[in-house]
Amino acid sequence: MRKLMIALALTTTLAVVAAASAALPHPGARYTGPTNSKVVNGFGNTVTFLAGARTLKRFSFGTLGCFGYGTFPVGVDPYSTSLAQLTKSVPVTAKGTFAVTSTPANWSGGDSDTKLKVSVVGSFSSATAAKGTISVTETGANGSCGPVKMTFIAKLGGQ
């Protein structure tokens, strides 16, 4: 009987630990953080998204594209004038991983002929932090380029 109780306690403990190790975001919360993109004029790049129960919504980040973005006037944040936002939500698994492949993004940079396809892969290391990689491919009148990759660490409520 004693061995049965020990085995039951051990099994229950392992099940609780396994369930607790799956880090999921807080639904309705905003996550924001820096990317490893090059700092331009003192301005860094940021990623931001809203967490749903099993999706990341309004996933956005700055990108200068891969064809080049022109000049960067002093005092102007080039990433804020060149935001990309995914047109669909990014699914989150029960284990806290997330991924979307080659999805279109609305982009405020470039010209109207330039289109972005974005892939995002990452995971939540806790309910308050996620890290991942964003890959951007650009297609326009001059052909296509990419992928340009950047990594990010986003935290609950901000940087």
Predicted regions and their residues:
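Positively charged n-region of N-terminal signal peptides that target proteins for export
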Residues: 1-4
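Bacterial N-terminal signal peptides
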Residues: 7-15
